[in-house]
Amino acid sequence: MSEIKLIVGLGNPGDKYADTRHNAGEWLIDRLSRRFNFTLKDEAKFFGKTARTVIDGHEIRFLVPATFMNLSGKAIGALASFYRIRPEEILLAHDELDLPPGTVKIKQGGGHGGHNGLKDTIAQLGNNKNFYRLRIGIGHPGDRNLVTSYVLGKPSPADWALIDKALDEAVVCVEILLKDGITKATNRLNGFKA
């Protein structure tokens, strides 16, 4: 396994979207910033907010794209290219319709499953799908015609309580991943349910 060098949190910019399900990846970066005491700063050349810190001897970069979701690959591609970070050294946190609230999973590779942030990231990384995904369950509205309004809506209080617990567990798992590797982090998440 390659060492993770970049952790990305997907979301849409602006206060209007801050509390929407589509910003689950950004919620994780916010928690990681509090846990590891780093501050994101705007960096125009990377089309987003970035930070760098050292965790357990590993230099890690963080990125929250300032672009809308469907263009987030532009930021990821720019930063990865500049620092020569390979796709398999990237952990991308995003909302996942196919997992219920309170669930979080790690996987490597795969398609975009209709997620525009993943779709653009794959394209901007030269069609390389080999990055890791930290999939934060938000549930599904039950009808694909309702997906857009669902991901751009706020979770119910009950769903938020489950997502909140899953985000706390994700922070612990990022620490495990950086210290002990992807397998231990994945195994822990496989046994987790909020």
Curated annotation (Swiss-Prot):
UniProt binding sites for tRNA: Y17, F68, N70, N116
Residues under site feature: Discriminates between blocked and unblocked aminoacyl-tRNA: N12
GO terms classed as biological process: protein quality control for misfolded or incompletely synthesized proteins; rescue of stalled ribosome
Compartment(s) where it occurs, according to its Swiss-Prot or TrEMBL record: Cytoplasm
Domain of life where this protein originates: Bacteria
Reaction equation(s) it catalyzes: an N-acyl-L-alpha-aminoacyl-tRNA + H2O = an N-acyl-L-amino acid + a tRNA + H(+)
Enzyme class: hydrolase
Marked site positions, Stabilizes the basic form of H active site to accept a proton: D95
Active site: H22 (proton acceptor)
One cellular component term from this protein's GO annotations in UniProt: cytoplasm
Entry EC number(s): 3.1.1.29
Record carries keyword Signal: no
InterPro entries noted in UniProt: Pept_tRNA_hydro, Pept_tRNA_hydro_CS, Pept_tRNA_hydro_sf
Gene Ontology MF terms: peptidyl-tRNA hydrolase activity; tRNA binding
Record keywords: Cytoplasm, Hydrolase, RNA-binding, tRNA-binding
Subunit and interaction comment: Monomer.
Role description: Hydrolyzes ribosome-free peptidyl-tRNAs (with 1 or more amino acids incorporated), which drop off the ribosome during protein synthesis, or as a result of ribosome stalling. Catalyzes the release of premature peptidyl moieties from peptidyl-tRNA molecules trapped in stalled 50S ribosomal subunits, and thus maintains levels of free tRNAs and 50S ribosomes.
Family statement: Belongs to the PTH family.
Name assigned to this protein: Peptidyl-tRNA hydrolase
Gene this chain is encoded by: pth
